[in-house]
Amino acid sequence: MEASSRVTVQVLLLALVVQVTLSQHWSYGWLPGGKRSVGELEATIRMMGTGGVVSLPEEASAQTQERLRPYNVIKDDSSPFDRKKRFPNK
């Protein structure tokens, strides 16, 4: 009985491997073989045809500089491994 169940499991595993290797994955906009249709590619390029330049509002630069300031400025004389500050009970 052990041999027949082992053969059954092997046949099922082989069938699963064959099914997975022979199946075709179809994505939206892709043709078999991983090739994209030229019409869709052309439409995508037209949508992205902004000249590669993204304009930012002038007010955003002041807000960005405020956001990029560090919250905590570390003093040069303090050590990050100062045990007395980190572990006051020891």
From Swiss-Prot:
Coiled coil: none
InterPro entries given in the database record: GnRH (IPR002012), Gonadoliberin (IPR019792)
UniProt keywords, alphabetically: Amidation, Cleavage on pair of basic residues, Hormone, Pyrrolidone carboxylic acid, Secreted, Signal
Modified residues (Glycine amide): 33
PROSITE patterns (alphabetical): GNRH
Function: Stimulates the secretion of gonadotropins.
UniProt entry tagged with the keyword Secreted: yes
GO cellular component: extracellular space
Protein name in the entry: Progonadoliberin-3
One family name in Pfam for this protein: GnRH
GO molecular function: gonadotropin hormone-releasing hormone activity; gonadotropin-releasing hormone receptor binding
Main localization (coarse): secreted
Localization per Swiss-Prot or TrEMBL: Secreted
Family note: Belongs to the GnRH family.
Gene transcribed to yield this protein: gnrh3
Positions of modified residues (Pyrrolidone carboxylic acid): 24
Signal peptide limits: 1-23
PANTHER family xref list: GONADOLIBERIN, PROGONADOLIBERIN-2
UniProt keyword annotation of Repressor present: no
Highest taxon of source: Eukaryota
